[in-house]
Amino acid sequence: MGKSIISVDDSSTMRRMVSFTLKSAGYEVLEAGDGAEALALLKTRAVDLVISDINMPKLNGIELTRELRSQPNYSRTPIILLTTESDPAKKAEGRAAGATGWIVKPFNQEQLLAVVCKVLPA
């Protein structure tokens, strides 16, 4: 079995694109529509990487990152944040929360896989 990744995004279109790209590359992919749903899933299933949108209802990507970093099981798990914002202050906030990487939307499949391969070596 390949490495497992959770894709967290309130846009079902974005989740499907991320999931398709990663599954095509041999990863096992779980999906969640927001940070709260992701936390519930991650209590029952461990993953090797978290890819999360920043702007979501209930629990946004930065809040999700902070919550995961406070849990022993996810204190070192790579977390990539996705956003339409290229604001340096937002990037700094994400990194301070514990994000490992950052992808600005829109992005293509090659860009996604390059970042995933960088933070999650084979």
Indicate residue ranges for each PLM-predicted region:
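Conserved acidic segment of CheY-like receiver
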Residues: 2-13, 18-22, 50
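Short hydrophobic/Thr-rich beta-strand motif most characteristic of the beta2 strand and flanking loop
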Residues: 26-33, 41
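Active-site beta3 strand of CheY-like receiver
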Residues: 45-51
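Active-site residues of response regulator receiver
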Residues: 53, 83
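Receiver (REC) domain active-site loop signature in two-component systems and cognate sites
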Residues: 56
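Short, glycine/charged-rich "phosphate-handling" switch motifs in NTP-dependent
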Residues: 100
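C-terminal output helix
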Residues: 107-116
